[in-house]
A protein has these predicted regions:
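Cap/insert and terminal regions of metallo-dependent hydrolase folds
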Residues: 152-248
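Conserved beta-strand hairpin/beta-sheet module of binuclear metal-dependent hydrolase folds
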Residues: 1-45, 129-145, 163
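Structured catalytic core of nucleotide-sugar glycosyltransferases
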Residues: 7-17, 58-68, 90, 118
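Active-site neighborhood of phospho(di)ester-bond hydrolases with catalytic His/Asp-centered motifs
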Residues: 29-32, 52-60, 80-83, 142-145, ...
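Metal-dependent catalytic neighborhoods of phosphoester/phosphodiester hydrolases
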Residues: 66-75, 90-92, 225-232
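Active-site metal-binding motif and surrounding structural segment of the metallo-beta-lactamase
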Residues: 35-81
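Metallo-beta-lactamase
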Residues: 83-139
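Active-site environment of divalent metal-dependent phosphoester hydrolases
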Residues: 14, 61-65, 86-89, 125-126, ...
Length: 255
């Protein structure tokens, strides 16, 4: 396997950004928080913006896009985003017309030695997507967060991946017993909301049986989950797999 790095720079409701590097080429998936926070986290992870060839956006929500404007102003890097998500950001996102590569949920592009392919995901946003990244040697990585449930399309794209970044957003008891208003609890728990620990854990044995070796649990809720709770439940569900829980405020390396 070629020189490979996969880590979340930060992950959670305050901001999301994932760094994937294969050899001398890297991509970012999402760019939440601020450009300063992003570059500081990237430096802490041992990465560099000099290697970043493109940014891939999952959807338009602020915790995934708030650093895009400053990033677009400072770096000559294409921003791959679905037509629906871009429409939601415009006209305020004046940087998009000169940087955006608009695409449908079914899209594939070559970036260095990586083939990045998008697939549709169920979330309360406009045309949200996940991504697979296939390396030159055939190794596949996959990314799926902000998903209300595991659809057949998600399963089809994640099956066979060597490593997967997968949402494990909330513990159902913590969510329902917590302080959130009823409408917000309903939104989070819906089929177009966020994936629970239990739903994530139920899928892990299927991934392992199909060859997945590494999973990074991502987009954990600070209010309705804890890294230890998510990790303990996931490891109990699939003890054979290497599983790591992303930390909200610091880089978490899977590979």
């Amino acid at each position: 396997m070629e020189d490979l790095q996969l880590c979340t720079l930060y992950s959670g409701s305050k901001g999301n950004c994932t760094y994937i590097r294969a050899g001398g080429d890297a991509i970012l998936i999402d760019a939440g928080r601020s450009l300063r926070a992003l570059t500081q986290a990237l430096d802490a992870a041992g990465g560099s913006m000099e290697t970043v060839r493109a940014v891939f956006v999952t959807h338009e929500h602020a915790d995934h896009t708030s650093a895009l404007e400053m990033l677009a102003k400072k770096y000559d890097i294409p921003i791959h985003i679905t037509e629906g998500s871009a429409a939601r950001l415009l006209p305020a996102a004046r940087y998009l017309p000169c940087r955006a590569v608009l695409h449908t949920p079914l899209y594939s592009v070559q970036v260095g030695g990586m083939t990045v392919t998008s697939f549709a995901t169920p979330h309360d946003s406009d045309m949200s997507v996940g991504y697979t990244i296939t390396l030159a040697d055939g190794c596949k990585l996959a990314y799926a967060t902000d998903i209300g449930h595991i659809t057949p399309e998600i399963e089809e794209n994640l099956i066979g991946a060597y490593a997967v970044v997968l949402e494990s957003n909330h513990d159902e008891d913590m969510l329902m017993g917590g302080p959130y208003p009823a409408w917000l609890k309903s939104r989070i728990a819906s089929d177009r909301g966020h994936l629970s620990n239990a739903a994530c854990d139920a899928f892990l044995p299927r991934l392992y049986a199909a060859g997945t070796k590494h999973v990074l649990l991502a987009h954990l809720s600070a209010e309705n989950n804890t890294p230890s709770r998510a990790l303990d439940a996931a490891c109990a569900a699939c003890p054979e797999m290497h599983i790591v829980a992303a930390r909200e405020g610091e880089p978490t390396r899977l590979l």
